[in-house]
Amino acid sequence: MPLTVKCPTCQTEVTWDETSKFKPFCSDRCKLIDLGDWAAEKNAIPVKPEFDPEMLDQLGYDEADFFMDDGSMDDKKQ
């Protein structure tokens, strides 16, 4: 018995085998709709932020500190 899955876009049953040209989608149209949703950022993979902006505030960092040119990189540019 072949494995069947539902198309992520329209929920149509799709047979999962070598003959399924657009798996897991039922058609090229559904595949492109899904791609468009990802491109428009309607879908997203949740990730944990690398740092908490509030933590930077607690440590005393100010946004202006990140963009200051104090000349410390001048020696490394040469």
UniProtKB/Swiss-Prot annotation:
NCBIfam families, sorted: PRK00418.1
Any one of the GO BP annotations: regulation of DNA-templated transcription
Function: Inhibits all the catalytic activities of DNA gyrase by preventing its interaction with DNA. Acts by binding directly to the C-terminal domain of GyrB, which probably disrupts DNA binding by the gyrase.
Source organism phylogeny: Bacteria, Pseudomonadati, Pseudomonadota, Gammaproteobacteria, Alteromonadales
UniProt: Zn(2+) binding residues: 7, 10, 26, 30
Cofactor: Zn(2+)
Subunit composition and interactions: Interacts with GyrB.
HAMAP family from the UniProt entry: DNA_gyrase_inhibitor_YacG
Metal-binding among keywords: yes
Family, as annotated: Belongs to the DNA gyrase inhibitor YacG family.
Keyword annotations: Metal-binding, Zinc
Organism: Shewanella piezotolerans (strain WP3 / JCM 13877)
Gene3D superfamilies: Erythroid Transcription Factor GATA-1, subunit A
InterPro entries according to UniProt: DNA_gyrase_inhibitor_YacG, Znf_NHR/GATA
Protein name (Swiss-Prot/TrEMBL): DNA gyrase inhibitor YacG
Manner of cofactor binding, per the entry note: Binds 1 zinc ion.
Pfam families, sorted: YacG
Keyword Cell division attached: no
GO molecular function terms attached to this record: DNA topoisomerase type II (double strand cut, ATP-hydrolyzing) inhibitor activity; zinc ion binding
Top-level taxon of the source organism: Bacteria
